[in-house]
């Protein structure tokens, strides 16, 4: 079993609007955005979703309208190997 002290430091973050709805949510790995991230409108609807690989946008990012329908997709490079 790996020594826990050798594992990368991770942290999750959730930022909220004044009305307490979530504004953005995601995780950090060693201080860099990493993994799934999402941004929301003040009404709580999803605005944009995508992934980071150690601070770099990767994969398909999606922009959603207020009903949740995908209105735009943007592709970014794949994660570093």
Where are these regions (language model features)?
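Glycine/tyrosine- and acidic-biased, solvent-exposed loop/turn segments at the edges of beta-strands
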Residues: 1-81
């Amino acid at each position: 079993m790996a020594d826990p002290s050798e594992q990368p430091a991770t942290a999750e973050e959730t930022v909220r609007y004044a009305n307490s709805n979530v504004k953005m949510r995601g995780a950090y790995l060693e201080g860099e955005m990493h993994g799934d991230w999402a941004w929301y409108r003040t009404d709580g609807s999803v605005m944009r979703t995508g992934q980071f690989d150690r601070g770099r946008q990767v994969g398909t990012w999606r922009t959603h309208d207020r009903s949740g329908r995908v209105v735009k997709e943007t592709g970014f490079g794949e994660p570093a190997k």
